[in-house]
């Protein structure tokens, strides 16, 4: 008997820029200042694995630890059971970390209970905050509401199969970022995750009981419904539903579990709380779930959500399902995180608008996602391709990268001038074409004066490319003559320093070198 509790905190925070670094350029510092105090929804995810007992997993809300003198049940004092549970948790941790998709970090005792100057997760939960300098707040339980300090809680629960849709899935289509030809797939519970723009906690519980005992109890319930079917047709319908559940479990080998999910939001403004209540209901409706605003069980569910206290969850607030369907109700998205790599560029999260440091070159190769650093920027006219390229190139240059650009529309002339003026002409060199001063190059100029075979072949290939059309293949005699002319010219400029290496002198010497043998041999 154990409980898997996934607790996702979504807290409104403001972006704090780092503008004190001396190496920041004018544009980088202006970028940081532009996003100063930008609000965004930060995500903190916790996963709690709790060992419980058969008796405690069946207790209801009227018999929690709040009503008893002994908090720890006697069964937990069994060292052998505790050792087996800890070993199972260790195996679970290794499996998750080895997957490469999720990283689990086990919390130390000081991170749970807190220490001087730093709050633990229990203290953060009681204050509905994730800051390290939280202050404890009074918790008020009133007939009409529950308060934590100045914040008023609003709770929506998924605790009955009648509130769930007819079918669930691992993912769903997100219309805002999807097109006619491509789908943006998010998890089934994404509407109550990062897409719900308010302070809230999304609790997801899976109660793993004795699978065989659960099916045995369902068999007994089905027989009872069968015997009472003559008194009510509803009993016959329920019996058929139970039989279908049992058939699925036996034929497909599915694990019977109990599940519960709730969204706990809060605000210190009653008018804003009304808006939040409507937003939560709308997001649940997007999941095709029936919004159930729970005003009675808020204190009990808040108490059961304390890290490590999941065993006090009231059994009447859970429903039976299978393990796969229960996992579909888990939130699987988070907001983007900054890369740990020192090399990267600043990008902005399209959902929250928060700047992030992203490495799109080295980190994907280290993780095996890509095998090269090529980038293909695709978009219609006016979509910001050149704007993004300017942004990327500038930051790469500021981090020491060597950049060579071929600019066909003067899109990067301004950036080059900025770098040129800032470096006093050392960088930001921009070659452009004009009728008076066209772009030219000299393949015959070599600083050390050494021409190897590769250099000679590249010069010959260049001249053939300029000479012949794409669909016109050179003759063998032309290739031999050109190769001899290039070799003779290179030998000439090596022996005679008065000859300036360029196309003009090559043409003049080629006329002499090629025309004379041609006349003697009558080659056409």
Residue ranges and their predicted role:
Residues 1, 342-432:
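Glycine-rich phosphate-binding loop of nucleotide-binding enzymes
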Residues 75-78, 82, 232-235, 266, ...:
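Hydrophobic alpha-helical scaffolding
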Residues 490-511:
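Long, K/E/R/D-enriched contiguous segments that form extended
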Residues 4-17, 35-36, 391-495:
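Switch/coupling segment of Walker-type NTPase motor domains
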Residues 1-333:
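Extended, folded cores of ATP/NTP-driven motor/assembly subunits in large transport
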Residues 512-524:
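Single conserved hydrophobic/aromatic residue that forms the stacking wall/gate
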Residues 86-93, 97, 264, 277-281, ...:
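Short, well-ordered alpha-helical packing segments
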Residues 108-116, 296-304, 413-415, 477-486, ...:
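A glycine-rich phosphate-binding loop feature that marks nucleotide/adenosyl-phosphate handling sites
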């Amino acid at each position: 008997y154990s409980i898997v509790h996934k607790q996702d905190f979504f807290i409104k925070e403001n972006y704090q820029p780092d503008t004190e670094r001396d190496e920041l350029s004018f544009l980088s510092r202006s970028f940081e200042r532009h996003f100063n105090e930008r609000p965004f929804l930060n995500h903190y995810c916790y996963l709690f694995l709790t060992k419980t007992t058969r008796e405690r997993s069946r207790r209801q809300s009227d018999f929690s630890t709040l009503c008893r003198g002994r908090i720890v049940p006697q069964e937990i004092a069994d060292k052998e059971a505790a050792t087996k549970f800890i070993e199972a948790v260790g195996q679970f941790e290794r499996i998750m970390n080895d997957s490469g998709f999720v990283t689990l970090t086990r919390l130390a005792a000081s991170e749970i209970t807190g220490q001087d100057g730093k709050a633990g997760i229990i203290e953060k939960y009681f204050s509905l905050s994730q800051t390290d300098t939280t202050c404890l707040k009074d918790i008020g339980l009133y007939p009409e509401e529950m308060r934590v300090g100045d914040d008023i809680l609003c709770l929506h629960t998924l605790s009955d199969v009648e509130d769930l849709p007819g079918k669930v899935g691992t993912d769903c289509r997100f219309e805002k970022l999807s097109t006619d030809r491509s789908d943006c797939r998010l998890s089934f519970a994404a509407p109550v995750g990062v897409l719900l723009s308010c302070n809230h906690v999304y609790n997801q519980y899976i109660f793993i009981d004795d699978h065989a005992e659960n099916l045995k109890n369902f068999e007994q319930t089905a027989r009872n419904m069968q015997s009472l079917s003559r008194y009510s047709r509803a009993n016959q319908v329920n019996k058929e539903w139970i039989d279908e559940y049992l058939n699925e479990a036996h034929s497909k080998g599915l694990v019977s579990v109990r599940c519960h999910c709730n969204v706990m939001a809060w605000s210190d403004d009653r008018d804003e709380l009304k808006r939040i209540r409507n937003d939560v209901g709308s997001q649940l409706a997007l999941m095709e779930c029936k919004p159930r605003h729970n005003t009675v069980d808020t204190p009990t569910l808040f108490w059961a959500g304390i890290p490590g206290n999941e065993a006090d969850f009231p059994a009447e607030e859970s429903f039976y399902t299978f393990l796969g369907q229960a996992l579909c109700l888990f939130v699987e998205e988070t907001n983007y995180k900054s890369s740990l790599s020192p090399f990267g560029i600043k990008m902005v999260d399209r959902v929250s608008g928060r700047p992030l440091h992203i490495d799109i070159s080295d980190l994907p190769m280290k993780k095996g996602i890509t095998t090269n650093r090529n980038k293909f920027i695709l978009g219609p006219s006016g979509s910001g391709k050149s704007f993004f390229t300017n942004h990327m190139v500038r930051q790469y240059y500021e981090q020491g990268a060597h950049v060579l650009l071929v600019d066909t529309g003067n899109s990067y002339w301004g950036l080059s001038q900025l770098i040129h003026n800032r470096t006093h002409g050392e960088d930001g060199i921009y070659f452009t074409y004009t009728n008076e001063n066209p772009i030219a190059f000299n393949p015959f100029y070599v600083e050390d004066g050494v021409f190897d075979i590769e250099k000679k072949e590249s010069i010959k290939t260049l001249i053939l490319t300029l000479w012949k059309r794409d669909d016109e293949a050179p003759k063998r005699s032309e290739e031999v003559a050109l190769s001899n002319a290039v070799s003779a010219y290179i030998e000439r400029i090596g022996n005679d320093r008065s000859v300036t290496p360029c196309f003009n002198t090559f043409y003049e010497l080629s006329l002499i070198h090629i025309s004379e043998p041609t006349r003697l041999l009558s080659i056409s």
